Curated annotation (Swiss-Prot):
Protein name per its UniProtKB record: Phosphoenolpyruvate carboxykinase (ATP)
Subcellular location: Cytoplasm
EC number: 4.1.1.49
GO-annotated biological processes: gluconeogenesis
Binding site for ATP: 211, 230, 246-254, 295, 331, 447-448, 453
Keyword tags: ATP-binding, Cytoplasm, Decarboxylase, Gluconeogenesis, Lyase, Manganese, Metal-binding, Nucleotide-binding
């Protein structure tokens, strides 16, 4: 049994006093009773749905609140954190010690004299490189969320649990002094890397706790040479590991969910001396327009112990997954074992030998697959490119480019080149190859078919792409295969999909110019400058 007196003393050391009761690492059964009990109001209230899962609302915060994210500027962080600047705007805004202390006082005062849920878990399935994290909240469903998302310790591990990091969730409290303190609003998500504490105030969005801890892993791991990556990962029957990077809408979840391979995880991973490991003990999947036919694994995972966020629940308790009236960002969290085809008992495997960067190029320029050199790997990893089609008033669809460093700029705490250095070092040690896979459009005006994309992924995973004769795509200087089994050869060189190759040329020059302009911000250090030659020639 865990010594609750010890837990209470540790809460007092944080500034949380006179706690009425500590509900420590509650079971799923307990959490179900707590979050559906009569008398709960507002955003604390859970609604039982016909799926068996409980649904909750998070109010106006239906996504993360990056404008309210701050990190304390101190001796430890001043020269390590990738601070926001005029040339490279990001979400790492500095906060002084006095403001931090006032926010900490607000949250600890809110949590004092209450009945609290304390959940201890691990972030990271590597015994050597995990963070022991403690989450303190007065809201039952928030305890449920973190029980789903973090790795659940054994009884034995809980006996002597010493938290490395504490998340204090005070979503009911806001900051009245935000204007004088020069903050963005009364809501806050603040980190102190020296005290190893995250404070949450004002926002009820569950993802702040999950993404907060992945931002912390993104700080601590690369500083000791361990990769920290926003990617999905799976492993084949022979133990061969593949990792998939990609922004939203590129097919990261779909392509890594493969009946022939076991899933390691769908979102956040580390790469240490043993291999690839999941940061999480659960999945946080989007549910808008979810159907059993299109995504059977996720659909079946929504059952008892899963937690739905911001979905529309009909009067009979059924869920309308097509209704995005509260938000398009409807979500479900569930423990990873709700998915059948996963790595057991621990979400980790050996070193990755295939690294896949997914992009959905709406400009119709990039090839469906290209093999990257180590320098190109760093360049395209730092660029983190994808593009969406957005309609304009006149009905013309204009591509909108997105460049997100390391395919996850919002969660990077260090300079992006540090993640690229660690990734390529790990790849070289493992003899891994990198590929850029375009799941977007080509000169036909149509999206590359899922059948062809799956054929490309299969050719990468089974090694047949290594035997293919290669050509080179000009401007981007990318190596492209001339033929692959099960893939339409007519699409492999994007120039061949245009009736007039000059059209590809002008689009390619335009896109190359965008890459070059975006990369200027990385040329502020020597590593970044050295990579310019690996990019396209505008």
């Amino acid at each position: 049994m865990t010594d609750l007196n010890k837990v209470v003393k540790e809460l007092e050391a944080l500034g949380i006093y006179d706690v009425k009761e500590v509900v420590y690492n509650p079971s799923y059964e307990q959490l179900f009773e707590e979050e559906t009990k009569p008398g709960l109001e507002g955003f604390e209230k859970g609604t039982l749905t016909t799926t068996g899962a409980v649904a909750v609302d998070t109010g106006i915060f239906t996504g993360r609140s990056p404008k309210d994210k701050y990190i304390v500027l101190d001796e430890k962080t001043k020269d390590t954190v990738w601070w926001t600047s005029e040339t490279a705007k990001n979400d790492n805004k500095p906060m002084n010690q006095a403001t931090w202390q006032s926010l900490k006082d607000l949250v600890t005062n809110q949590l004092s004299r209450k009945r609290l849920f304390v959940v201890d878990g691990f972030c990271g399935a590597s015994e050597h490189d995990r963070i022991a994290v403690r989450i303190v909240t007065e809201v039952a469903w928030q305890a449920h969320f973190v029980k789903n998302m973090f790795i659940r310790p054994t009884e034995e591990q809980l006996k002597n649990f010493e938290p490395d990091f504490v998340v204090m969730n005070g979503s009911k409290v806001t900051n009245p002094n935000w204007k004088e303190q020069g903050l963005n609003s009364e809501n806050f998500v603040a980190f102190n890397l020296t005290e190893r504490i995250q404070l949450i105030g004002g926002t009820w969005y569950g993802g702040e706790m999950k993404k907060g801890m992945s931002s912390m892993m993104n700080y601590f791991l690369p500083l000791k040479g361990v990769g920290a990556m926003h990617c999905s990962a799976n492993v084949g029957k022979d133990g061969d590991v593949a990792i998939f990077f990609g922004l939203s809408g590129t097919g990261k979840t779909t392509l890594s969910t493969d009946p022939k391979r076991e899933l390691i995880g769908d979102d956040e991973h580390g790469w240490d001396d043993v291999g690839i490991f999941n940061f999480e003990g659960g999945c946080y999947a989007k549910t808008i327009h979810l159907s059993e036919e299109n995504e059977p694994d996720i659909y079946r995972a929504i059952r008892r112990d899963a937690l739905l966020e911001n979905v529309v629940v009909r009067s009979d308790g059924s869920v309308d997954f097509d209704d995005g009236s509260k938000t398009e960002n409807t979500r479900v969290s569930y423990p990873i074992y709700h998915i059948d085809n996963i790595v057991k008992p621990v979400s980790r495997a050996g070193h990755a030998t295939k690294v896949i960067f997914l992009t959905a190029d709406a400009f119709g320029v990039l090839p469906p697959v290209s093999k990257l050199t180590p320098e190109q790997t760093k360049y395209y990893f730092l660029s983190g490119f994808t593009a969406k089609l957005a309609g304009t008033e006149r009905g013309i669809t204009e591509p909108t480019p997105t460049f997100s460093a390391c395919f996850g700029a919002a969660f990077l705490t260090l300079h992006p080149t540090q993640y690229a250095e660690v990734l390529v070092k790990r790849m070289q040690a493992a003899g891994a190859e990198a590929y850029l896979v375009n799941t977007g459009w080509n000169g036909t005006g149509k999206r590359i078919s899922i059948k062809d994309t799956r054929g490309i992924i299969d050719a990468i995973l089974d090694g047949s792409i290594e035997k293919a004769e290669m050509g080179e795509l000009p401007i981007f200087n990318l190596a492209i295969p001339k033929a692959l089994p099960g893939v339409d050869s007519a699409i492999l060189d994007p120039r061949d999909t245009y009736a007039d190759k000059a059209q590809w040329q002008s689009k390619a020059e335009d896109l190359a110019g965008r890459f070059v302009k975006n990369f200027v911000k990385y040329a502020t250090n020597e590593e970044g400058k050295a990579l310019i030659a690996a990019g396209p020639k505008a």
